[in-house]
């Protein structure tokens, strides 16, 4: 069908339509543009969408692991800037954790961020693998280590920033309509205000979000 044929723009438009129905922001507080439903209600919605195959994968990646890191761990400015767009479906998100050499051992990721001399930006370099919704995401939650830190930190990136590139879509056996990409970061300038939560707390964010998202 059109979804599995990866018709250009179809999946993002379906997420936007779900957003118009309030389904994308079901668990987001009303003051941030969502419906403010409880966890049980969100699960009922997700169960109903579960038969949607490729759409269900894209929907849950966007509403869960892409949106919840900012909703749960973002400061007030970050939430006001990004959550209303994510809750409406006008912005699409992705979660960038896995790397070629770090799958189940996610905290061994090699992506690195270095603070500039003026202290205004982090310069991010690295590669992420098998990123669901990566092909059409506007907002990327990216995990990388700052300098020589032992633990990951988390950052909020925007797709149109210089230095973000990606490979063509992965050729999958199933759920073909759900975008899956490799994403590369080459000297991406990330404003310091886009550090999510606290330095060195990215692994905590990553696993907690996977548990609930």
Feature roles, as predicted:
Residues 36-46, 105-109, 184, 190:
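Structural signature of FAD isoalloxazine-binding scaffolds in flavoprotein oxidoreductases
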Residues 58-77, 103-106, 115:
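N-terminal glycine-rich flavin-associated loop
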Residues 102, 129-135, 175, 211-212:
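Glycine-rich phosphate/pyrophosphate-binding beta-alpha loops
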Residues 22, 29, 45, 75, ...:
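Buried hydrophobic positions in well-ordered alpha/beta secondary-structure cores of metabolic enzymes
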Residues 89-97:
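A short, Trp-centered hydrophobic/proline-enriched beta-strand micro-motif
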Residues 1-60, 77-88:
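Amphipathic, small/basic residue-rich leader segments at the start of a protein or domain
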Residues 120-166:
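A short core secondary-structure module
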Residues 51-52, 164-213:
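Glycine-rich beta->alpha junctions and the first turn(s) of the following alpha-helix
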């Amino acid at each position: 069908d059109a979804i599995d044929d990866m018709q250009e723009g179809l999946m993002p438009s379906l997420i936007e339509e779900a957003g118009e129905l309030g389904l994308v922001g079901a668990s987001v507080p009303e003051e941030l543009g969502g419906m403010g439903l409880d966890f049980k209600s969100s699960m009922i919605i997700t169960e109903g969408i579960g038969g949607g195959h490729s759409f269900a994968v894209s929907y849950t990646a966007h509403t869960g692991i892409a949106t919840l890191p900012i909703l749960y761990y973002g400061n007030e400015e970050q939430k006001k800037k990004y959550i209303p767009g994510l809750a409406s479906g006008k912005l699409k998100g992705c979660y960038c954790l896995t790397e070629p050499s770090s799958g189940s051992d996610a905290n061994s990721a090699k992506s690195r961020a270095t603070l500039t001399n003026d202290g205004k930006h982090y310069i991010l370099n690295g590669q992420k693998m098998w990123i669901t919704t990566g092909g059409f995401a506007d907002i990327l939650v990216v995990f990388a280590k700052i300098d020589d830190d032992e633990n990951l930190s988390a950052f909020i990136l925007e797709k149109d920033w210089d230095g973000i590139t990606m490979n063509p879509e992965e050729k999958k056996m199933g759920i073909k309509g759900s975008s899956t990409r490799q994403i590369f970061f080459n000297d991406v300038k990330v404003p310091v205000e886009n550090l999510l939560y606290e330095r060195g707390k990215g692994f905590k964010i990553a696993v907690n979000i996977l548990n609930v998202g």
